[in-house]
Amino acid sequence: ARLYRNEIAISAVDTPVPRAIASQASDELLNISGILASFVLYPGAEGEVMISARSIGSCNVQMVLEPLGGGGNAATAGAQIRGSTVRDVLRELVASIDKFYET
């Protein structure tokens, strides 16, 4: 995982993992001191890019993921993006995080 904006952990992997494992990883990243939000990106079984997101702070993960087609609530959200790569979705995610913090 990498640290972004001093309070967000982002983990992106190129290997498919079960959804439950990605959700657990999102939860566990919040246990790191100072981390208020986490995003785990991974390829899904059908080639889509999956995102599992969690927050315990001011970062509303639902609002961050809505522009990417995701949903959920302020503390727990997810997205499935078809026709893209983990790397490209990571760039879109970072842009969406930046936009969230600018508003």
Predicted regions and their residues:
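Hydrophobic helix-and-loop "lid/oligomerization" segment in the mid-to-C-terminal part
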Residues: 1-68, 72-103
